[in-house]
Amino acid sequence: MTRLCRTFQTAPAAIPNDNSAKFLVSGLTSKGFQAPDWLVPDIEDGTAPSMKDEAVDNIIEHIPDHADDFAGDILPRVEWAYDDANARERGIEQVTRLAEAVGEELDGFVFPKVGRLDDVRDAAGVIADAERDAGLPEGTLEMAIILETAPGRSDLREICQYATDSRLSGLVFGPVDYTAELGGRTLDGERPRWDGLLEALSNETSAADIVAIGGPFDQLFHERAGVTYYNAEGYADQVAYEATIGIDGSWSLHPKQTEQANRIHMPTVEEMERDLHKIESFNEAKREGTGAVVVDGQMVDEATYKNFANTVKTVRAIDETHPAQTEAYYDDDLLARARDVELIFG
């Protein structure tokens, strides 16, 4: 998987402030490791009901000013719910307005609270209609969905299979609404982890070659002895777990979270050195006509080679989108090797 989405940062598209687009513009102008791979201007839960129209207006006003300089993808989260016709109508209107006004600057839309496969098809149809009405080429706008309902979970495999022949490019876990819909409880201060769901999400999205994104971590700050401090450790633990099971990216609610997730979902210097060494040694052995190849005591075949190649492909994807991040993270020699090495498999 080389589609880049280490970070899925939601930013309220309108807030009750003299500068209601403050967080939207902040996301669009973020630099360095605080620049997300996917910026999600939020018209849904992150924006008060009375400010939804202003949120759409803010996106229309500010996206053209910043889209060319923003390296990542921009996908607004619109209103939608499989069991709420009014929410779907509002979402249709939002998609239609945005596609008409700034469709050329957007990469797609995020639909929350989708139900079974037919509901996902309906959401995709909304984008197709808006795309056509706006005069955009077919397939210009992608779609990501938030998996946060029981019907959506029941059709997870079918939804991912649908992605192989549609504009669906990513699935995002929404644990808060999912827990509420299932009647889950928070006991002893601990929320359900939903390990089985996350592992299924990783598997099914990998099979469909689309991205999987973990859920939000909203315990941003702790307070102790009158001092409030950022909960860096808690978020890092969640992101590291997601990375371990093959979740491609993590939901970010704050620039500090974006910086952490970008780094955690980035191959370490040690990983890069190790995997490049094995790729280079394998390539050299093959040039010399060697059959079986052993590198540092490990038998390397096509399958293990592809694992090493994934590291390089990830770094190349980051380097293409955010060169300032790779240049700050890796030394010049290591980065040059990653850019230049031939990948025989993968």
Swiss-Prot record:
Gene3D superfamilies in UniProt: Phosphoenolpyruvate-binding domains
Matching InterPro entries: Aldolase/citrate-lyase_domain (IPR005000), Pyrv/PenolPyrv_kinase-like_dom (IPR015813), Pyrv_kinase-like_dom_sf (IPR040442)
Cofactors (names): Mg(2+); Mn(2+)
Pfam families named in the record: HpcH_HpaI
Annotated residues for binding of Mg(2+): 148, 177
Record's keyword terms, sorted: Lyase, Magnesium, Manganese, Metal-binding
SS bonds (residue pairs): none
Enzyme class: lyase
Positions contributing to substrate binding: 176-177, 253-254
UniProt GO BP: oxaloacetate metabolic process
Cited SUPFAM superfamilies: Phosphoenolpyruvate/pyruvate domain
One Gene Ontology molecular-function label: magnesium ion binding
Cofactor binding mode and count: Divalent cations such as magnesium or manganese.
KW Manganese (keyword) present: yes
Catalytic activity: (S)-malyl-CoA = glyoxylate + acetyl-CoA; (2R,3S)-beta-methylmalyl-CoA = propanoyl-CoA + glyoxylate
Coiled coil start-end: none
EC number(s) per entry: 4.1.3.24
Protein's job: Involved in the methylaspartate cycle. Catalyzes the reversible cleavage of beta-methylmalyl-CoA to propionyl-CoA and glyoxylate, as well as the reversible cleavage of (S)-malyl-CoA to acetyl-CoA and glyoxylate. In addition, it has a small malyl-CoA thioesterase activity. It can also catalyze the cleavage of (S)-citramalyl-CoA to acetyl-CoA and pyruvate.
Family from the record: Belongs to the HpcH/HpaI aldolase family.
PANTHER family tied to this protein: CITRATE LYASE SUBUNIT BETA (PTHR32308:SF10), LYASE BETA SUBUNIT, PUTATIVE (AFU_ORTHOLOGUE AFUA_4G13030)-RELATED (PTHR32308)
NCBIfam families, sorted: malyCoAlyase_Halo
Protein name, as recorded: L-malyl-CoA/beta-methylmalyl-CoA lyase
Organism: Haloarcula marismortui (strain ATCC 43049 / DSM 3752 / JCM 8966 / VKM B-1809) (Halobacterium marismortui)
